[in-house]
């Protein structure tokens, strides 16, 4: 199956990640491999690129497209929240770089047939892992209470008309179950009051359902709790987010890791002994250029945050070769 995806802010990612020959780099959201191919060119001849993705189509495509560099490439059908376990499988202490692109691939939107897009009439599935397991989006909209649906739309979609939309869904599912993306989009559009906005009225509802079905924020939190253990000293982490929920989680975790002394400000000397664990590389989020937005409108809401793991006493200098740890 042809796999189409346009990578966002490729040059900015390369600049922040700074891959070099011999490095181990993990692309935790492999997709079509756009970022990965550019990274691989910079870590050859002795580097190792590791990819993870929940979408089996992405894994199959990667195996075919990167067959020419099989000694420098490994791909896993797994969630990025399990990168530490993946590194263990590879016999690695850590990586020199990790990149996550938290956006939904064009392939999932346009080719998967799983109802990710409100512009298509497809079965309302929304599971990124098409191999099965876990509830589908249609299970959620047909079985959850009105209050539960409203909470999901408000919490994960920041949808201000969440209660109104949830009420309409519950009403309409009594006529017949809601099983397709097109019908759900029509129901949401019929419930929304006010003049048409810049985005489709179903945008936030579809985002919320996708996040809930795939437990996306929990996986992001899990990864961020283990990210330091995944990086070698001097290793860098670069995360591209597309909505404020993800960005707030990343910003908060980066700030916590970069914080030093936590003693009250009126203490004359530090007694906590806490030291910063990372250096934040993006004092302000990096956004796409106007030229990129014009070329790829889907990039308009992208934001990059990046950090570098600081070397600690006894760990040696940063930037060491991850493959040497095998």
UniProtKB/Swiss-Prot annotation:
Entry binding sites for S-adenosyl-L-methionine: 33-35, 53, 77, 101
Pfam families: Methyltransf_5
Entry keyword annotation includes Transferase: yes
PANTHER family per record: 12S RRNA N4-METHYLCYTIDINE METHYLTRANSFERASE, S-ADENOSYL-METHYLTRANSFERASE MRAW
Known EC number: 2.1.1.199
NCBIfam families: 16S rRNA (cytosine(1402)-N(4))-methyltransferase RsmH
Keywords, in A-Z order: Cytoplasm, Methyltransferase, rRNA processing, S-adenosyl-L-methionine, Transferase
Protein name: Ribosomal RNA small subunit methyltransferase H
Protein's job: Specifically methylates the N4 position of cytidine in position 1402 (C1402) of 16S rRNA.
EC main group: transferase
Keyword hit for Cell membrane: no
Record's catalysed reaction(s): cytidine(1402) in 16S rRNA + S-adenosyl-L-methionine = N(4)-methylcytidine(1402) in 16S rRNA + S-adenosyl-L-homocysteine + H(+)
Family the UniProt entry places it in: Belongs to the methyltransferase superfamily. RsmH family.
Gene Ontology MF: a single term: rRNA (cytosine-N4-)-methyltransferase activity
Organism: Desulfatibacillum aliphaticivorans
Transmembrane region(s): none
GO biological process: rRNA base methylation
Superkingdom classification of source: Bacteria
Cell location: Cytoplasm
GO CC annotation terms, alphabetical: cytoplasm
The gene coding this protein: rsmH
Gene3D superfamilies for this protein: Putative methyltransferase TM0872, insert domain (1.10.150.170), Vaccinia Virus protein VP39 (3.40.50.150)
Main subcellular location: cytoplasm
